[in-house]
């Protein structure tokens, strides 16, 4: 399996890159697409400083987990102060995982989900441990759906991918 994690300032640039890859490369033509997820960066509701790692210009990490999710029906009509407190608790639960970088993107009306998340870290264990810890926050009660999960190691040399293909 291969996951491609692309980002650009303009969505049309992503569409062009995807279409060019699928149409003009042998590798792209050979792949069977399983899933495509799309998100846009929008300012966070309560923390305008919460920016995706890729927007902050951070170097990509060695491991990534990407997944979509949708909040519960009552999340958006909940008292804003209560929602803010839940998000503060959620963020504080991640305090020991500063090396795990979050990329949170809005996906409303772009597919079947409301949000797209991508966590990057130096090791896969760090992502897994963080995701486990986040299960103990009250905000977790307000997640309706969060499947599928895709995880993988960053590969910078296409030869490495070709070497392991069946």
Report the location of each language-model feature:
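Short, well-ordered alpha-helical segments in soluble proteins
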Residues: 25, 90, 94-98, 138
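A common structural junction motif
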Residues: 22-30, 134-143
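A cross-kingdom feature marking solvent-exposed beta-strand/loop segments within repeated
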Residues: 1-3, 98-103, 113, 135-138, ...
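Extended cationic-aromatic binding surfaces that line active-site or macromolecule-binding grooves
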Residues: 1-24
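Catalytic micro-motifs at enzyme active sites that drive phosphoryl/nucleotidyl and oxygen chemistry
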Residues: 22-24, 52-55, 103-105
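Short S/T/G/P-rich N-terminal loop/turn motif that feeds into the first structured element of a domain
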Residues: 9-14, 32-96, 108-112, 122-132, ...
């Amino acid at each position: 399996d291969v996951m491609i994690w692309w980002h650009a300032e303009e969505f049309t640039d992503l569409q062009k890159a995807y279409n060019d890859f699928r149409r003009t490369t042998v590798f792209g033509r050979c792949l069977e697409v399983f899933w495509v997820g799309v998100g846009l960066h929008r300012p966070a509701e309560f923390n305008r400083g919460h920016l995706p790692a890729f927007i902050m210009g951070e170097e990509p990490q060695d491991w990534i987990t990407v997944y979509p999710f949708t909040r519960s029906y009552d999340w958006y009509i909940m008292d804003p102060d209560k929602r803010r407190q839940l998000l503060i608790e959620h963020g504080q639960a991640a305090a020991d995982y500063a090396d795990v970088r979050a990329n949170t993107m809005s996906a409303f009306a772009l597919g079947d989900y409301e949000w797209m998340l991508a966590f990057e870290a130096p090791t896969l264990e760090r992502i897994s441990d963080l995701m486990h810890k986040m299960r103990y926050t009250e905000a977790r009660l307000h997640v309706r759906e969060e499947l599928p999960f895709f995880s993988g190691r960053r590969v910078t040399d296409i030869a490495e991918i070709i070497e392991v293909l069946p």
